[in-house]
Amino acid sequence: MSSEVLPASIEPPNVEGKPGASDSEEERQKQRVDAEAQPISKRQLKKLMKQRLWEEQREQRKEKRKEKRKRKKLERRCQLESNSDGNDRKRIRRHVAPSNLRLIIDCSFDDLMVLKDIKKLHKQIQRCYAENRRASHPVQFYLTSHGGQLKKNMDENDQGWVNWKDIHIKSEHYSELIKKEDLVYLTSDSPNVLKDLDESKAYVIGGLVDHNHHKGLTFKQASSYGIKHAQLPLAEFVKMNSRKVLAVNHVFEIILEFLETGDWQEAFFTILPPRKGAVPAHKACESSPQDHQALPGGWDSAIEGEHGRDDPGSPHKEQQGQQSSSVSAVSPDPQ
């Protein structure tokens, strides 16, 4: 039987791996041991203890957060119950009794306004919408002839308008939507003074920020369509030191206020901004008869300065006497 002898040049395999590998591992272990053996400072020890305590209290913090949420929920519920009388209008609306009265903003003057005034009209419409939503007796709100620059501006700057509730936004003219006998156009050039509001009627406010460029336009439009027209009884109750200009939203809010109170004077003085310097007309009469003679015959719901009082074509010409100042109702700045 023959035996084989390994050549002298062949060495047994190194079962411990490559040379130097074990040395490297030993060095790393030694470094870790040395690091653990090094004493830590009081600050580090305090930090470690704080971290450990934080981890131990994790569940307790969860429970505290749950309790806090429950407590806040209960507080909100109690607050709502305590405000059940309607004082908190943001959370609880007062008793709402919708009115049948239709209030229309006529937007058919789009091509007569520059973009700056279109934006102002848009803001005034936003205010009207917000006030109607909060009102005790909200009206049936219409925007008619909606399109052109106004619609484009609303699309670009107020995309939420498409989700507005309790409003009728129509591209058609108001005369196509409502019977002629039900329409009443509000304009300061009308010789008719409004004494009361008829909830079966539809009152039209001209949506035009004009700066006195188109005098008498709304009155002419009402006459051409053969519809009724009237002015609010502003001069009977109010004397203003400033220019007698009411924004679209002012006219809208005055009507909302009158529906709630049934009192024109209260409606005017609740809505008119302080900067107008408004005082009751009877007091102005007592203090200055001359000022009383200068009181205008009304206001203009559509544009600034429809028919000056000296205009030959003004329907106020026969009534004006010593009146010389014109009145308008749409301010270029929304309130």
Swiss-Prot record:
GO molecular function, one term: tRNA (guanosine(9)-N1)-methyltransferase activity
Subunit structure: Interacts with tRNA.
GO cellular component: cytosol; nucleolus; nucleoplasm; nucleus
PANTHER family named in the record: TRNA (GUANINE-9-) METHYLTRANSFERASE, TRNA METHYLTRANSFERASE 10 HOMOLOG A
Gene assigned in the entry: Trmt10a
Primary localization: nucleus
Entry's localization field: Nucleus; Nucleus, Nucleolus
Biased composition, class Basic residues, residue ranges: 63-75
Residues the record lists as Phosphoserine modifications: 22, 24, 331
Substrates-to-products reaction catalysed: guanosine(9) in tRNA + S-adenosyl-L-methionine = N(1)-methylguanosine(9) in tRNA + S-adenosyl-L-homocysteine + H(+)
Sequence ranges of Basic and acidic residues compositional bias: 52-62, 304-319
Annotated stretches, region: Disordered: 1-91, 279-335
Protein family per UniProt: Belongs to the class IV-like SAM-binding methyltransferase superfamily. TRM10 family.
Name of the protein in question: tRNA methyltransferase 10 homolog A
Function statement: S-adenosyl-L-methionine-dependent guanine N(1)-methyltransferase that catalyzes the formation of N(1)-methylguanine at position 9 (m1G9) in tRNAs. Probably not able to catalyze formation of N(1)-methyladenine at position 9 (m1A9) in tRNAs.
Domain of life where this protein originates: Eukaryota
Tissue distribution of the protein: Ubiquitously expressed. Is more abundant in brain and pancreatic islets compared to other tissues (at protein level).
Pfam families: tRNA_m1G_MT (PF01746)
Coiled coil: 52-84
Keyword annotations: Coiled coil, Methyltransferase, Nucleus, Phosphoprotein, S-adenosyl-L-methionine, Transferase
Example GO BP: tRNA methylation
Top-level EC class: transferase
Location of the SAM-dependent MTase TRM10-type domain: 88-279
EC number: 2.1.1.221
